[in-house]
């Protein structure tokens, strides 16, 4: 049977012979129960298909021609236009990535900790990411952290352990002033 198909393929060209579905993957080895998959309905392909001409949409009218757009309420003033505009997005708003003391303790960081070290220990993705140290967890060793922000509880816990904190913005200002 297979040889005959190959001979036919060489005689008529490979595009003339129907290809069998790939059945060598593990998911295809298990037979699919009858009725588990439903074939897509081909509509609008002539009267012999039983869903030709109007393609199951009834005859004429708004719904036969196209769909109604999202949020359309039949001509009534839609809710997104009935409700007033409110607020704005500040262009000065900064989004801080939260870093808990628990994360620093878990990664085993000690000594001076800044963005570069946090990227190396995979706490942060990039050095340029703004991050804030939060106080969830305990810190046992003295650490000296340079970050963009600190919560009150994080400040207390770091200083209690004998560490220190510095804001990255203050360091940038100090270095820019010394360059002048």
From Swiss-Prot:
GO terms for biological process: translation. One of its GO terms (molecular function) is rRNA binding. InterPro entries: Ribosomal_uL15 (IPR030878), Ribosomal_uL15/eL18 (IPR021131), Ribosomal_uL15/eL18_sf (IPR036227), Ribosomal_uL15_bac-type (IPR005749), Ribosomal_uL15_CS (IPR001196). It comes from the Bacteria. Keywords: Ribonucleoprotein, Ribosomal protein, RNA-binding, rRNA-binding. GO terms for cellular component: cytosolic large ribosomal subunit. Pfam families: Ribosomal_L27A. Residues 1-62 are annotated as: Disordered. The keyword rRNA-binding applies. Gene3D superfamilies: 3.100.10.10. PROSITE patterns: RIBOSOMAL_L15 (PS00475). Belongs to the universal ribosomal protein uL15 family. NCBIfam families: rplO_bact. Binds to the 23S rRNA. Part of the 50S ribosomal subunit. This is Large ribosomal subunit protein uL15. It comes from Leptospira interrogans serogroup Icterohaemorrhagiae serovar Lai (strain 56601). The lineage of its organism: Bacteria, Pseudomonadati, Spirochaetota, Spirochaetia, Leptospirales.
């Amino acid at each position: 049977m297979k040889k005959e198909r190959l001979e036919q393929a060489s005689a008529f060209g490979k595009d003339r012979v129907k290809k069998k579905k790939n059945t060598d993957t593990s998911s295809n080895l298990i037979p699919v129960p009858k009725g588990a998959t439903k074939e897509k309905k081909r509509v609008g392909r002539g009267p012999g298909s039983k869903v030709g001409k109007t393609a199951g949409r009834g005859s004429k009218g708004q719904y036969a021609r196209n769909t109604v757009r999202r949020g359309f309420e039949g001509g009534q003033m839609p809710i997104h236009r009935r409700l007033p505009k409110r607020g704005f997005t500040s262009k000065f708003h900064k989004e801080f990535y939260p870093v808990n003391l628990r994360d620093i303790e878990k990664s085993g960081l000690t000594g001076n900790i800044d963005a570069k070290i946090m990227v190396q220990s995979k706490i942060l993705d990039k050095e340029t990411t703004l991050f804030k140290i939060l106080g969830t967890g305990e810190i046992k060793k003295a650490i000296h952290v340079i970050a963009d922000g600190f919560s009150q509880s994080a400040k207390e816990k770091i200083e209690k352990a004998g560490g220190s904190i510095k804001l990255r913005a203050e360091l940038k200002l100090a270095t820019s002033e010394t360059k002048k």
